[in-house]
């Protein structure tokens, strides 16, 4: 019965210690959150006071009601700033005390709360002394604290307290500009890089289990200012927005460039061909597809048809009703055969040209032709009708 009562008491004390530890951790988290909020309010008040002081310096010496209200507001802001600074320092001290109490050594009751299913025999004096030494040694080492604390300035982290290191997956280089008047931080550019083993020379301003932030440039001008977790998250969010905006602008420029190139491809450009001289007789203004010297095509439109049986009606339809018909009879002499007049009424060719053409066509065989053919040529007469 005594063993069961002791085990029950030790179990209750252990549960009570665990509950107190959880309560202390929750209180630490609440105070940290309150500290972050007050730091943000303090920074806002400082930037506001700096802006109001700058506005007062630019106003003329003659005081007005607006300037008096502004000075009164500045005094109230300075008083709030002092109160916030005192509150921030107090919260920092309270958090430090709570963290120190959380890592304090456990009580002897917590260390001796391990249940023993088998009742051990009464220890001898030597064993009692040895047990006391073990308890003292365990009390000197806080429960839950690592025995070997590794401090590293690199993003390499230990895994479960083992000496195996976890390498960084990537690094982000963020260019930040801070307005000295308003205190606002603006991200200029964000570039994702491979992790560099010789780390850039800078000052570490933030570190947790997943991220390490180094201030590379501008530490001499702006001083060393450690960042909080909320500030780091806000900085990463702004960097992501800048990266997305740059990607969107690049895609829009590529689409515009592709549209311009497609329009230039589809629209044929007019080119001037040098080194070609137009001939006087060439037709330069004709329709496309017609070579020089060719007649342009004629467009014919079918207007209908009409059946005509009478010849007079036919002439009337064709417009030949009042035309004059003439017949020309040419009688050739037997000594000098002449060519008849052309049927279309044009001028006859000179006799020399006609004779030479007949000689060229007939050749030497013309002199030895049969007399029957010559008689046929003499007695043949031709007539034509001129309309």
From Swiss-Prot:
Compositional bias, Basic and acidic residues, is annotated for 31-41, 69-102
Positions with biased composition (Low complexity): 104-117, 286-296
One example of the protein's molecular function in GO is:
D3 dopamine receptor binding
Q: Where is the lipid attached (S-farnesyl cysteine)?
A: 384
Prosegment location in residue numbers:
385-387
**Where are the disulfide bridges?**
none
**Residue positions bearing lipid (S-palmitoyl cysteine):** 381, 383
Subcellular location field: Cell membrane; Cell projection, Filopodium membrane; Cell projection, Axon; Cell projection, Dendrite
Q: Which residues carry this modification: Phosphothreonine?
A: 141, 145, 243, 367
List keywords of the entry alphabetically. Answer: Acetylation, Cell membrane, Cell projection, Cell shape, Coiled coil, Lipoprotein, Membrane, Methylation, Palmitate, Phosphoprotein, Prenylation, Synapse
Q: Where is this region: Disordered?
A: 31-160, 247-296, 335-378
Tell me, what does this protein do in biology?
Involved in plasma membrane dynamics and cell process formation. Isoform 1 and isoform 2 are necessary for axonal and dendritic filopodia induction, for dendritic spine maturation and synapse formation in a palmitoylation-dependent manner.
Instruction: Tell me which family the UniProt entry assigns to this protein.
Output: Belongs to the paralemmin family.
Q: What is this protein called?
A: Paralemmin-1
Per the UniProt record, the lineage of the source organism begins with: Eukaryota, Metazoa, Chordata, Craniata, Vertebrata
